[in-house]
């Protein structure tokens, strides 16, 4: 069930990346944040009800609230005109929690691929903290591109693989996933770099 919510997290991360780049207006992006945030609160609640005390099911559901609260916070704050610092510092909490979930994926859940994915989310939410919490606006373009490029391989792609029964998690697959995500972060840095000014020809006067 969690994979259904993960599918739409890929969509909202993509849109939020475009919002950071100034391509999508803030209020327009807020609507999708509210939809996905609500979904990511309902889905884990249903999972907890169905878990019947199964610790692994409870663990799987608990992390989804991090996304639900993030997107509800973003949607409400943007529509109400709140300052971004609150979201930024909450993002620091999410980043720290993601490190714990990554460790648990490697050690308890025996899921190295999601261990890598949680590390990617930790890095991304750290960027959100720097931009929104500390006002590091010079990182906005890099963060926007990082959100766009990481949204699909960390959310949409694994969601579809799980939904179709084609998700496999081994150390070798996790290593490949990690390499691909690092390449995408490098690409985000390149895309975020300021474009060099094109020299204009000097006018010639007779």
From Swiss-Prot:
Coiled-coil boundaries: none
Summary of the function given for this chain in its UniProt record: Possible transporter that might be responsible for the adsorption of amidase substrates or release of their hydrolysis products.
Protein name: Putative transporter protein AmiS2
Entry keywords, A to Z: Cell membrane, Membrane, Transmembrane, Transmembrane helix, Transport
Family: Belongs to the AmiS/UreI family.
Places the protein is found: Cell membrane
Transmembrane segments: 4-24, 29-49, 56-76, 86-106, 113-133, 142-162, 173-193
Topology in membrane: Multi-pass membrane protein
InterPro entries in the cross-refs: AmiSUreI_transpt, AmiSUreI_transpt_sf
Listed Pfam families: AmiS_UreI
Chief site of localization: membrane
Species in which this protein is naturally found: Rhodococcus erythropolis (Arthrobacter picolinophilus)
Cellular component aspect of the GO annotation: plasma membrane
Superkingdom of origin organism: Bacteria
């Amino acid at each position: 069930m969690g994979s259904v919510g993960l599918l739409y997290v890929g969509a909202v991360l993509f849109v939020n990346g475009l919002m950071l780049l100034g391509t999508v207006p803030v209020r327009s992006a807020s609507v999708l944040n509210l939809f996905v945030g609500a979904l990511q609160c309902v889905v884990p609640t249903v999972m907890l009800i169905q878990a019947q005390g199964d610790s692994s099911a409870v663990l799987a559901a608990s992390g989804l609230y991090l996304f639900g609260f993030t997107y509800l916070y973003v949607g409400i704050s943007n529509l109400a005109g709140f300052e971004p610092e609150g979201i930024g510092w909450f993002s620091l909490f999410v980043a720290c929690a993601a490190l714990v979930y990554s460790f648990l994926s490697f050690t308890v859940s025996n899921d190295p691929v999601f261990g890598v994915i949680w590390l990617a989310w930790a890095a991304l939410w750290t960027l959100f903290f720097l931009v929104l919490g500390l006002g590091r606006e010079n990182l906005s373009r890099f963060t926007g591109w990082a959100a766009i490029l990481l949204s699909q391989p960390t959310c949409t792609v694994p969601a579809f693989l799980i939904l179709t029964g084609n998700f496999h998690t081994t150390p070798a697959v996790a290593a490949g996933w990690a390499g691909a995500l690092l390449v995408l972060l490098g690409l985000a840095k390149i895309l975020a770099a300021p474009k060099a000014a094109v020299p204009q020809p000097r006018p010639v006067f007779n």
